Amino acid sequence: MFWYSSPVFSLNGNIIIQGDLVDEPCSLQIGSELQTVKLGNIIKNTLYLHKRTVNYPFYITLETCDISDKHQVEVSFNGEEDILQPGLLATAGTAKGIAIGIKTEEGNKAEINRTITKYELEGGNQTLTFYAYISASDAVIEQKSITEGDFSAYVSFMLSYP
């Protein structure tokens, strides 16, 4: 008797499982930690007429909040600040004369690298709403020197529980 056996091929892979064990009252919903806010096409004349665009919402969602020990969350935003418009984000790209601002749901300015906005924690899940907008400085508007092109900015946020 003759037995023929074909060779067996196998592929190996690796899986990394990771996380953080923390002493915080809430966890951050997956997807909240890395977001892209798409602003689309902004018409330059909108900035000359109104100095800024409409608000574009984005959300930070907290999950499974346990308020038995801590009752507030503080949110701060950090990034490269615009030179002409302090408190707003500087942009990268070919567009010039603009900066990106952030506002709270209540309409208060969340200044980059300084403002800490406080929220009362609710038990369970809670969504914090913020808005991004494009702004042009008074000098750029007066000189009609906005340059069209692509733009982007990177901002990080920090949650702390006092």
Task: Give a label for each model feature.
Residues 4-162:
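Mature extracellular/passenger domains of Gram-negative fimbrial/pilin and adhesin proteins
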